[in-house]
Amino acid sequence: MMDSRGRPLIVVDPTTLSRSPAYGHFLMAHECCHHTLGHVRRLYDGIGQLGPQPFYYIRPQLKQMELDADTCAVKLLKATHETEAISAARETMLSFGTKPTGAYYPTGIERADNIAKTAAQD
């Protein structure tokens, strides 16, 4: 998300952060990664607003953006030795099972597998 001046914003439900601080660390890293990877700018460049509903024409890209942000977040958390946050993220994604984790997003299983694969890399 961007503010009215085009500055990056991250909006997170505080309940999510208080309910599971470990998952909250992952979530914040994940959202930061969307900004650093250029995903947010891409959504605001116009194409994300075309079509019968928001993001309709970039829905295949949205799935990959989520996986890329997960990968980036795991790498950040590994670098700071926050293995509990990585585990919490995987467990949270597994709770979605074969259902998508959001509109046009990967399934929980896909995201959990991606998190585990990234965490296992050196």
Give the label of every model feature segment.
Residues 16, 22-25, 31-48, 79-81:
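Catalytic Zn2+-binding segment of zinc metalloproteases
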Residues 78-122:
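Long, well-structured alpha-helical subdomains associated
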Residues 9-11, 26-27:
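Soluble periplasmic/extracytoplasmic beta-strand elements of cell-envelope proteins
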Residues 1-9:
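Catalytic zinc-binding patch centered on the HExxH motif and its immediate surroundings
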Residues 61-80:
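An active-site-proximal "capping" alpha-helix that borders the catalytic cofactor pocket
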Residues 14-18, 54-63, 99-102:
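Second-shell loop/turn segments in exported
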